[in-house]
Structure formats: structure tokens, C-alpha cells
Amino acid sequence: CPPCTQCRVAPASGSNPSVAEMSTLFDRIAAGPQAYGTLGWNFGGRTTVGAGPGWCGTTGRRDTVPVTFPCVLLKAIYLTESAWRQFCTTNQTVISFDCGYGIAQVTSGMRRGETSSYDAARVASSAAYNVSVGAAILADKWRASPCVGLNDPEIIEDWYFSVWGYNGFSFRNNPNNPMFRADRPEFRTPGVASAQVRSNYPYQELVWGYSRYPLTSAHYRGIALVYP
């Protein structure tokens, strides 16, 4: 995983936590910055999100709640992004061609000449901090995305458009894009039989597939999700 020469921060040296350690880490980050404290980034103070259909132009509750995430959602997103790797086999930070760093493949503010409100060096060096920044970006997508269902952040399926937005809210990830077969089967991860080619699916369907079919049973217990 060679770093892009246009990236802001040099790769850090380190080793990946074990699968069990990563699973525990995701559980802690999913509880939100008010729970995990100095383990990660504080989301720049943006520690609440809107919940309820009242935010969607309809009647119903319109609450503001602390940011939390369904645990399996974070685990599935970051299997999709990096297979839970902060560091390459060379013990250097995973950095993609477009300056995506680490487990969460954080790109915002990570290109040369850009700035960020979070510590870019810690994004490169710390698995916990990296994941917390990725979670903050996902929370921002929730705030900016169309509502699904009851607009309840405790329901994984209600994050559908937020997950789409995490990879870019573009036509490339539109499930009706003609580049994808209309009769495509659900995505199955490389860790199970009948795995499919990732490029044949929009991003959010990869995450839904990883949610049901983790790489191994040690990662988490798979959950089948429905589509909006």
C-alpha cells in the first residue's frame, strides 16, 4: 500500500491490533465521543444528531440525541474500507492512491495543502483515533442525507444514505446505475463461499453484504439487513 506523493502526512510505523482488540475498539467508538473520551477525536464538539421523522418534513418526533452508532455498522463499513487494517504488512500506515488513511480510509483534510480540525498525524498513527474520525465523518453524512424509515440512528437500515455518502453520494453508487446488473445477487464477502466481485456493486451494498457475511466469525456475528 504505497502512499500517494500528494498526501499531507507521512505514514506512521506500527502494528495492527488483533481482531478481538479491534472489535472491542469499534464497540467503544460506537458509543460516541461522550463515552470514549480521549481514546479518539471529540468530533469537533458536534456530538449530537437529529433523530425522528420530524426532521424529514413530516409529522412525528424531532429529537436531538447524542451521536452513537449501531456497532455492526461501523464494523461492516471498515471491513469494506480496509479489512480493519491501520498498517500494511510493512508496518506502515495504509494510504490509498487518493490519500485515504488507515482503517477508516480518511481522505478529508489529508491531502497536501489541506487543513483539518482533527490531528492528521494521529489519523495516520492511531487506530482508535482514525476510526473515531471516520465515525465523525459518518455522523456528518447522517446530518446531510435524506431520511430513511423513522430516521432513527439506532436502526442500522436508517443509515443507508449516510453509508452511501461515506463513499461519495454519487451516481456511481446509485443502485439503479445501469452498470450494475438489475438481477445481481446480494454481495458476499471473500471470506465465504460464492464471493462476488466488489466492482459489480454500489458501495452501500458492499457494506450490507459485509454486515451479513463478515470475513470470519471472530469479527462479529453477521446480521442480515433490509433495503429501504
Which positions does each model-derived feature cover?
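Extracellular/periplasmic catalytic domains that process cell-envelope and extracellular macromolecules
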Residues: 1, 66-71, 96-99, 155-157
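Non-catalytic cell-wall polysaccharide-engagement segments
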Residues: 1-36, 107-228
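Short secondary-structure capping micro-motifs at structural edges
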Residues: 61-62, 89-93, 115-122
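Structural recognition of the beta-strand scaffold that forms the well-ordered cores
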Residues: 73-79, 85, 102-107, 138, ...
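Short, surface-exposed glycine/acidic/tryptophan-bearing loops
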Residues: 89-113
